[in-house]
Amino acid sequence: MANKKEKSVTMPTVTDAGAVQEDVWIPAVCHAQCVDQGCLMKVHRVNGVAVGIEPNTDIENYEKLVRNRGKLCPKPYMLLQKVYNPHRIKTPLKRTNPEKGVGIDPKWVEISYDEALDTIAAKLKSIRGSDTIKLAEARGTASIRNEGWWAFLRSFGPTQILWGGRSTHCRQAQHAFGDRIHGGSACVPDLDYCNYLIVIGANPAAAGGAAENPLFAKARERGMRIIAIDPVLSATAAKADEWLPIKPGTDCAFILAMINIILHEIKIYDVPFLKEMTNAPYLVGPDGYWLRDKETKKGQVWDPVDGRAKTYDDPGIKDFALDGTFEIDGVKGTPSFQLLKDHMKQYTPEWAAAETEIAADKIRRITKEFVENARIGSTIEIEGARLPLRPAATHVGRGITGQVHSYQTILADHILAILIGGLEVPGSHMGGSTFAKGRRSKEGYLFRGNGMSSGVEVGEDGMQDTHHRDFQWPPKSYSGWEMLIPFMDDHPYPKPPFDNPAESLYSMDHIDWLNLVDPPKGLPVPPLPEMWIRHRCNPILALGESKYAIDVLKRIPFTVSISYTMDEVTDFADIILPDQLELESLVPIFAIREAGHRKGFMIPLHQPIVEPLPNIMNINNVLAELALRAGFIDEFNVQMNKVIGFGDKDPEKLEPGKKYSWEETVDKKCKFYTSGKYGLEWFKQNHILVRPVSIEEAYDIHFNMKAKKLRYPVPYMEVVKRTGDELNRNLAGKGIDWWPTDEYTALPVYFAPILEEAPKDHDFYVVNCRVASTSWGANVGLPWVNEISAQLRGVGDVLMNAATAKKRGIKDGDEIWIESTTGKIKQTVRLCHGIRPDCLLISGQFGQWGMPVAKETNRASISTLLPISIAWTDKMTGNQQWIAVKAKVSKAK
């Protein structure tokens, strides 16, 4: 056990100067500081005051079974300053100035919780059950993890989305198409066995957090090579064996060239895997669709031994043809693998070199090393199970998915994986999980994974399910996302007829706000909401062109903000409810197993460490109380039962006619997850249930695909082409011509980066990153965060290539103007050599003007430079182009 005094962060200014009556370490979970799920920690409490935090290493075999393996990123330590922040909102507040706007004093007055809740409930009651949706909501990661938030929205009825950041910062393309290809909403390499890793558009060393970094460290100790492809010498690139400074926006070209080299130069690929585990042998007709058997309507393959077409599941198949073209009943059919080979001829290394500005010989060498390290055909025995071994993988991140055309890159990345047979096997491209809906152990304990992953779902033609939404007119949401991006939905969640935009985790946040100000031709945008409730998100800062969010917020009649300090958005609120913080809250973190950690399952409880401030309620209790006062507590209980997973006959389910406290609900959830064995008090005393993961669970997608005789729906995404054709016809029928569908391709196609459409004098690529300490933006209101940022060169400032700066007469520490077509910022410049000469780097989560402490940092945000428009929106995923923008630079006077 480490020495607590040496490792913990202390805050002597808040400790009791009197006698020590209590000195304890309490196990806890960092649960709302990032999108990862739950790092174990413990908090030092003296006389009721939290004074220190360190990783929890008390659990037996923690380095194997616990996801953060005795490590923490900076954010958990900040919770001490957060809970004792002198700028906290400590009581409900009511606006008395009806005029709303930036910098306009709301003239707040303190009110009681009763007055605040009665006021909010009266408004909810008046708009509930209307013909149009009159409530809109905005949530952050912490909200999503509160069962009460989901239960409240579903029980209230249809609710609009007016978020801030989901379509801007999340990895939509990877979530949607990783899920459809191999049941994984987040793709990661299997670092336990990977020997050769290509990192593209990702920076796990800085942003991977406590769970990922130990895995990378051990892999490096084992000898894993890393190739970092990034415009900037990031923390990951600095630790890599090789850094390739790619031109922003051209990552897809690099991967396409790798596929070309494998198919047409190296000519080594995993033939058995392609034949048995993918749709590579499926025959495609001249129209681009599967060539189907006339009687059964099933997809067909060509058996070269018998010399005829057979349905894909014909038990008499002797072999599968991958090459050639065949005639079936007068119609030519070509295996999708042959189409892939033909299609990829255009993407040569020389072509990619011109796009990426990475030399063709380097692309060839990297590809050759990738294939050699994949050890195609090799196997490994783990815990008595014989599995394919493919110790080569890619790791793509927000640098890929934060661009338009991101589906093309994600599809190409998965095709690269299947060529070496490297999908969901040791050492390879991973991410899938069959535990999204949960599975009980033999002891009766329910272990549940990330709910966004569908796992293995039987789909059409013997493949993994590739579901999508049917066309809906008129759309219900402000952006029309449920109509325009049919692949963006949440498969594991209930899917009723779509009438509730808030039912999903996906949206087009930036377009929601835009359409309420400037709706596009022919789209029937629903009316402005009468009420907006917001928790832990900031649409003014998170999106581009803040004028749209500001315009809308000024016009919404009634706004509720659940906030812990004042910020940019609270200026527009009518009622503010204080937010209970992490060290004060009770949170059961019961869905914690994700793809990056395949060793153990955890069911941990985060319990309150310090007494909540006397006038601050837990958000789940707030929402239950609002449901009671607004008259829909019975519906709230029904939906809470569904969210937790209670069945109709489950003894722990919430009954109608009663409002349950959050503590009562958590006690029921604890018993449900342990088949009645352990309740809340047991978890308060024991903190956690943990068990090892079996080999069948660690690689559950592979075992399940084999058991169900399913194939991965690649390389040829016929369903995407078919869906795009349907969407194109439907949109044309409604007179909508501003949403192109040309990206709905079955094979990956390279589209020129939208960045190249900028004016010629915009000669810098402004790229974005984020580091662990400043994620989320609310943390910038903490002095410790800013002290750390000041020690990280470039964090909070803008990084510029030293040679470029010299040519322009710019020195380290100068201020420069950076101007895009939509915004202009002034920022201090820091010079370095580890960045492309034509690039600037701005770290994220800054730009505050309303949050105490943060507004004093005088740091800019790339969001100011980002356009909000249809053109800057990914047509497959709804993601905003936000990872890079082009701008011109001048020295500030």
Predicted ranges, named:
Residues S130-K134, Y269-L274, T379-E381, E424-S433, ...:
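Flexible, glycine/charged-enriched surface loops at secondary-structure junctions
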Residues W149-K218, R222-M224, A253, D323-G324, ...:
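Extended redox/cofactor-interaction regions of prokaryotic respiratory oxidoreductases
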Residues Y113-K134, C187-Y196, H343, I366-A393, ...:
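Glycine-rich phosphate/diphosphate-binding loops that line cofactor/substrate pockets in enzymes
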Residues M1-Y269, E276-K318, G333, S453-W473, ...:
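N-terminal export/assembly segments and adjacent metallocofactor-ligating motifs
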Residues E60, A142-E147, H169-R171, A205-G208, ...:
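Flexible loop/turn segments at secondary-structure boundaries
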Residues K4-S8, Q607-I609, N615-S675, L782-L799, ...:
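Long, contiguous, secondary-structure-rich segments that constitute the structural scaffold
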